[in-house]
């Protein structure tokens, strides 16, 4: 069944009416979905979408004028000059027209308001672009100069939205298979002002299943043996979740089902061709999948390339244009499209964009709607929306079913795949994605593709131009090309009143907020680029003529920026472009919100089974989409005005808005203070105010004269809240009147939303309390929280739970007569319970999430991913599955826990087990499977204590000296240190670890001192050899004999020892004074000669003992950890000897003595710890352990060591 048959079956009445209209060439309604341009030769615009009944349609718009405007000084003298300029550059144009427009930058008085422009017409976009580039380089100001997407300019000029119903008139019509082709001119297109009929565009939701013979890996399209073995597709009306048809294309036999049509293919190549064939039969307007732009489309395209069928597939799927492979890859396969998710995050998408079908990745849409979502899986988004979940089918089972070709089991796979596709449409409809984006397109004169794949800034810019160019807004000439030097710097910061930190339990606090501060400032002060006056001279001249100006000044990059804006004084004709647009948007939104309220009230009165409920629901969704679109534009308006890459950017305007915000908040602050009110906190656009004590005198006295029960106190609090609400309502009206008198307009207004009581301020933009909106409500389970980290992305349940307990406990109503525990006491009580009663916590309380961004220096995540990579490689070597350690996609969030590692110390008592977060992280599945212990103390110290410190850092003991600049940071650091010590005192395991470290350090210190003594003895012996100036050789021999007496046995001469002595003698020779015969060098040569000739017996004995020394060293090294020994040897050799000549002679002795000492400490450390109760081990005990160990090394050298 193809699209036309489905349309005829589902909409027979409308289809008959549309058929009659086509036969009589009567006007038709058309809903555009996709836009394509023919930019070579004569410009042609193609619009693809559906007719009223659902027929697929192509609208070809011809005879579209191609032009741009250039500003000139005189309409009489410059046309010829402009012609000569273009001719000199061989730029071909059709004709020139002279017109007048208002330049967008700079104020112009009434008589000079309009400037002459020449509109240059061309036959092609190529010539137009050449001319724009040339004239801009020559310094001319151009307008209507879009160089990327000309269709946006067409939409603006014709006032023809590209995402709403259009009426086709005087068209030529040609049926072409499933497609109904129309040819029109711009005059034949009329924007349909009403909401129009129900849209019957078709959405195809799909999902693919892939297979790899390498178990535990994600199938890779670049691997020849990895295949796509199933593609399931479902089609819907754009507004519905009821499927119109379903198809399963599979390479494995699948049991038949009434829910879908099954197509069995013999190969992957045939499966892909069948997918294209089915796609062409349904001719969808929108194609959607979940994460398909990151996996499904790249897999399909890559496999099609490998089979050599991409060109055939594209041309089957595209009902309109057939293309060659190189053109497909260049123009229609979007390999890397950056989609903005939030201000901080973007994601790369890849897809095949066939003309007439708009691809939409549902995952991207959901991530934009929930930019702080910790999980971005299909299952997570479905749960978040309360929709039915996807089918649970593990990949290893799916692959097993595919391998066995079990038709019944493959039916389960098909159902799994079909439901995944179904859930994509469920999410699109639930979130009203298409209607919302369409309303944005209607306002901004952009396409649906623009609304999905581009950020909000360019839409605001396009909307501004659309308003500006028409007569009712003054025919302002706007360029789309950013000009001038683009400086980077900070605009004036917000006016901030530091919070009065701590818990407020006696007086309610009320927040007064400016309603949409920046848009309101733009409307109030007429901030608009064409109202800007740059020079003081011109400003004085205008004021002398009676004009009212608003002066702005601020410092930017250490220089004063100033300017003036001509005020409108509430005269509509004097309003600038920006205020006019904002006022229009505000009025439209106000009307829509009123309508939305009425529709909502109707919905509550009608049951879902009522015949008119669905229509009412549809109307409610459409109105809501419109008001949301207006809200988006109003909120992003200032962002574009302050964007230095925007063609509308004006530095005095951007900074003037923020500095005016400062001024007005200060104005209100002083007004409120002078009225006797108190200020708890103020920032940017809001003040938190307390009423005078006198307001509560009567109710307080009534309580004091009562029995002061808890009920009486609750009544007192209740009445305080009511009094505050009434007082704030009056104050708010007075503030707004004061603002009106100051700025002369009613656009800048404040409103109060709620009364907070009790309330606690913990820092800038950080506070919580109980909010009372319309009536008093002292429910501690519904707290008003701003900026407290328990709602931070990635935060654990542990932190959220502890933070919530502290806040809820602190918000309890307590009479002044009762004990009111200070916040620090509440924090310590909650913390103690959390640390001591560990059994209350579940595994899920410790799960965290983080994002994998390879290009960012997140050390913990980088270390963790490096460890996981090493594990995967190790498992692959052994042929084991490694999917549990798979790396997430860049930008994707993953879940993990921090696990406990075994406590280890080095010989000096320093912790050697890694405390780095990245070394303790484990995937949740791995930690659960192996039952790894959670490092609770790590969570407490690194996540919980920072939050808890925020609650108590206002305490006097944590306050910094006067000379500290960042007082909040200082107090926070001191408070956290205080809580760390508190946790150490109550955490039994932490106390044990500290004691172990003390024992290690004591043991090391004693052993180190003993070894230094032994080394000192031998150092003194050999120093005597040098100090004996009368007979040094004899002194050396005696010292050597002293050493040799501790060894016995005859062995062969150790030639390596002889080499060492020879090398040392040579090195010493090089180090000596080359002039004359230095005594040191001569002495060494004499020693060497005597060793070889005169004292052969003693030397022979020394050589013989060399083997014994080497044997001893080998024994020691083989019985201890060599790496630790080597490291600690370097650490312990911190003392020096007076003569470098003895270094070699001491080297052997020092080395094996130190190694023996380390061996002692290492060997007996556990015994020391096991015997350790509450007191450190005695010196006698340690000495005894050392003597026992030294004796066990080798009996013959016991005395020598001990």
Swiss-Prot record:
Stretches forming Sequence repeats: 1071-1074, 1075-1078, 1079-1082
Name this protein carries in UniProt: DNA polymerase beta
GO BP annotations, alphabetical order: DNA replication; viral DNA genome replication
EC annotation from Swiss-Prot or TrEMBL: 2.7.7.7
Described purpose of this protein according to its UniProt entry: DNA-directed DNA polymerase involved in viral DNA replication.
Source organism superkingdom: Viruses
Reactions performed catalytically: DNA(n) + a 2'-deoxyribonucleoside 5'-triphosphate = DNA(n+1) + diphosphate
Region (3 X 4 AA tandem repeats of A-G-[NK]-[PA]): 1071-1082
Keywords of this entry: DNA replication, DNA-binding, DNA-directed DNA polymerase, Early protein, Nucleotidyltransferase, Repeat, Transferase, Viral DNA replication
Source organism per UniProt: African swine fever virus (isolate Tick/South Africa/Pretoriuskop Pr4/1996)
Gene Ontology MF terms: DNA binding; DNA-directed DNA polymerase activity; nucleotide binding
Additional remarks: Consistent with its intracellular location, ASFV encodes its own replicative DNA polymerase and three base excision repair enzymes: a class II AP endonuclease, the repair polymerase Pol X, and an ATP-dependent DNA ligase.
Xref: Pfam families: DNA_pol_B (PF00136), DNA_pol_B_exo1 (PF03104)
Keyword Endoplasmic reticulum appears in the UniProt entry: no
Family label: Belongs to the DNA polymerase type-B family.
Induction: Expressed in the early phase of the viral replicative cycle.
Broadest EC class assigned to this enzyme: transferase
């Amino acid at each position: 069944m193809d699209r036309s048959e489905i349309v005829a079956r589902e909409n027979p009445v409308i289809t008959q009416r549309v058929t009659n209209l086509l036969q009589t060439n009567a006007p038709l309604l058309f809903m555009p979905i996709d836009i394509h341009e023919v930019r070579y030769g004569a410009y042609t615009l193609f619009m693809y979408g559906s007719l009223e009944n659902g027929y697929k349609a192509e609208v070809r718009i011809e005879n579209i004028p191609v032009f741009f405007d250039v500003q000139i000084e005189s309409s009489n003298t410059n046309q010829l000059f402009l012609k000569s300029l273009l001719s000199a550059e061989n730029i071909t144009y059709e004709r020139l027209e002279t017109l007048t427009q208002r330049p967008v930058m700079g104020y112009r008085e009434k008589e000079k308001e309009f400037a002459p422009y020449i509109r240059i017409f061309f036959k092609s976009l190529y010539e137009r672009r050449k001319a724009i580039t040339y004239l801009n380089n020559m310094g001319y100001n151009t307008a209507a100069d879009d160089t990327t997407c000309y269709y946006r300019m067409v939409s603006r000029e014709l006032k023809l939205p590209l995402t709403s119903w259009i009426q086709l008139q005087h068209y030529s019509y040609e049926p072409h298979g499933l497609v109904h082709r129309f040819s029109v001119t711009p005059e034949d297109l009329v924007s349909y002002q009403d909401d129009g009929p129900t849209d019957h565009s078709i959405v195809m939701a799909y999902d693919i299943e892939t297979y790899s013979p390498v178990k535990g890996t994600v199938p890779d399209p670049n691997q020849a043996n990895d295949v796509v073995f199933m593609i399931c597709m479902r089609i819907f009306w754009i507004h519905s979740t009821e499927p119109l048809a379903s198809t399963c294309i599979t390479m494995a036999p699948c049991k038949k089902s009434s829910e879908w049509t099954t197509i069995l293919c013999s190969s992957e190549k045939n499966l892909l061709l069948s997918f294209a064939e089915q796609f062409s039969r349904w001719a969808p307007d929108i194609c959607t999948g979940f994460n398909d732009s990151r996996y499904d489309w790249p897999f399909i395209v890559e496999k099609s390339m490998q089979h050599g069928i991409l060109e055939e597939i594209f041309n089957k799927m595209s009902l309109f244009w057939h293309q060659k492979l190189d053109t497909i890859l260049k123009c229609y396969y979007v390999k890397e499209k950056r989609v903005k998710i939030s201000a901080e995050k973007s994601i790369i998408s890849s897809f095949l964009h066939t003309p007439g079908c708009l691809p939409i990745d549902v995952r991207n849409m959901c991530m934009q709607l929930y930019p702080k979502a910790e999980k971005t899986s299909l299952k997570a988004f479905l749960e978040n929306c309360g929709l039915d979940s996807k089918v649970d089918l593990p990949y290893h089972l799916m692959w097993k079913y595919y391998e066995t070709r079990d038709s019944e089991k493959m039916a389960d796979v098909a159902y799994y795949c079909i439901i995944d596709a179904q859930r994509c449409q469920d999410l699109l409809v639930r979130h009203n994605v298409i209607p919302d984006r369409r309303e944005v397109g209607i306002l901004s004169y952009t396409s649906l593709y623009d609304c999905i794949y581009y950020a909000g800034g360019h839409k605001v810019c396009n909307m501004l131009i659309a308003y500006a160019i028409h007569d009712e807004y003054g025919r302002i000439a706007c360029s789309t090309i950013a000009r001038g030097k683009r400086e980077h710097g900070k605009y004036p910061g917000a006016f901030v009143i530091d919070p009065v930190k701590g818990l407020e339990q006696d007086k309610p606090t009320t927040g007064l907020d400016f309603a949409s501060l920046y848009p309101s400032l733009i409307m109030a002060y007429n901030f608009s680029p064409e109202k800007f006056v740059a020079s003081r001279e011109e400003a004085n001249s205008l004021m002398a003529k009676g004009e009212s100006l608003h002066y702005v000044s601020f410092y930017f990059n250490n220089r004063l920026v100033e300017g003036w804006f001509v005020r409108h004084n509430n005269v509509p004709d004097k309003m600038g472009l920006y205020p006019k647009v904002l006022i229009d948007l505000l009025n439209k939104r106000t009307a829509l919100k009123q309508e939305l309220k009425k529709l909502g009230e109707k919905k509550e009165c009608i049951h879902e089974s009522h015949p008119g409920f669905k229509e009412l629901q549809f109307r409610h969704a459409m109105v809501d989409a419109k008001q949301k679109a207006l809200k988006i534009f109003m909120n992003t308006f200032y962002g574009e005005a302050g964007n230095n890459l925007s063609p509308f950017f004006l530095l005095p305007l951007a900074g003037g808005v923020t500095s005016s915000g400062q001024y007005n908040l200060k104005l209100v602050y002083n007004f409120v203070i002078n009225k006797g009110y108190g200020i708890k906190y103020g920032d940017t656009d809001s003040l938190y105010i307390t009423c005078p004590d006198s307001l509560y005198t009567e109710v307080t006295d009534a309580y004091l004269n009562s029995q002061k029960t808890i009920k009486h106190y609750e009544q007192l609090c209740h009445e305080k809240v009511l009094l505050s609400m009434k007082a704030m309502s009056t104050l708010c009206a007075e503030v707004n009147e004061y603002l009106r008198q100051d700025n002369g307009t009613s656009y800048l207004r404040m409103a109060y939303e709620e009364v907070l009581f009790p309330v606690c301020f913990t820092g800038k933009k950080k506070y919580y309390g109980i909010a009372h909106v319309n009536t008093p409500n002292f429910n501690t389970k519904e707290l008003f929280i701003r900026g407290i980290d328990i709602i931070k992305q990635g935060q654990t349940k542990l932190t959220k739970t502890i933070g919530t307990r502290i806040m809820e406990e602190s918000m309890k109503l307590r009479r002044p007569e009762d004990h009111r525990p200070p916040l620090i006491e509440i924090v310590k009580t909650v913390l103690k319970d959390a640390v001591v009663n560990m059994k209350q916590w579940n595994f899920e309380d410790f799960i965290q999430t983080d994002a994998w961004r390879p290009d960012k220096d997140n050390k913990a995540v980088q270390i963790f991913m490096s460890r996981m990579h090493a594990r995967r490689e190790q498992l692959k070597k052994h042929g084991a599955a490694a999917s549990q350690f798979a790396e997430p996609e860049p930008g994707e969030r993953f879940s993990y826990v921090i696990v406990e590692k075994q406590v280890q110390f080095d010989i000096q008592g320093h912790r050697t087990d890694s405390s780095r977060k990245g070394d303790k992280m484990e995937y949740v599945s791995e930690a659960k499977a192996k039952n790894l212990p959670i490092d609770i103390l790590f969570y407490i110290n690194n996540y919980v204590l920072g939050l808890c410190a925020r609650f108590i850092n206002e305490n006097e003991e944590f306050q910094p000296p006067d000379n500290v600049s960042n007082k909040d940071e200082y107090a926070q650091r001191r408070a956290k240190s205080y809580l760390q010590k508190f946790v150490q005192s109550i955490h039994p395991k932490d106390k044990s670890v500290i004691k172990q470290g003390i024992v290690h350090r004591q043991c090391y210190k004693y052993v180190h001192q003993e070894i230094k003594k032994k080394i000192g003895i031998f150092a003194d012996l050999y120093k005597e050899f040098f100090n004996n100036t009368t007979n040094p050789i004899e002194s050396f021999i005696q010292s050597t004999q002293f050493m040799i007496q501790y060894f016995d046995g005859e062995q062969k001469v150790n030639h390596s020892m002889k080499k060492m002595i020879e090398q040392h003698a040579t090195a010493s020779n090089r180090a000596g004074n080359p002039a004359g015969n230095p005594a040191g060098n001569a002495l060494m040569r004499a020693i060497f000669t005597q060793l070889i000739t005169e004292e052969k017996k003693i030397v022979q004995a020394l050589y013989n003992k060399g083997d014994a020394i080497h044997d001893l060293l080998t024994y020691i090294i083989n019985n201890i950890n060599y790496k630790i020994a080597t490291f600690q040897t370097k650490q312990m050799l911190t003392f020096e000897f007076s003569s470098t000549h003895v270094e070699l002679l001491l080297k052997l002795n020092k080395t094996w003595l130190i190694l023996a000492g380390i061996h002692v400490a290492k060997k007996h450390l556990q015994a020391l710890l096991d015997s350790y109760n509450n007191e450190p081990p005695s010196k006698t005990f340690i000495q005894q352990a050392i003597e026992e160990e030294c004796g066990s090394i080798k009996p013959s050298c016991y005395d020598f060591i001990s």
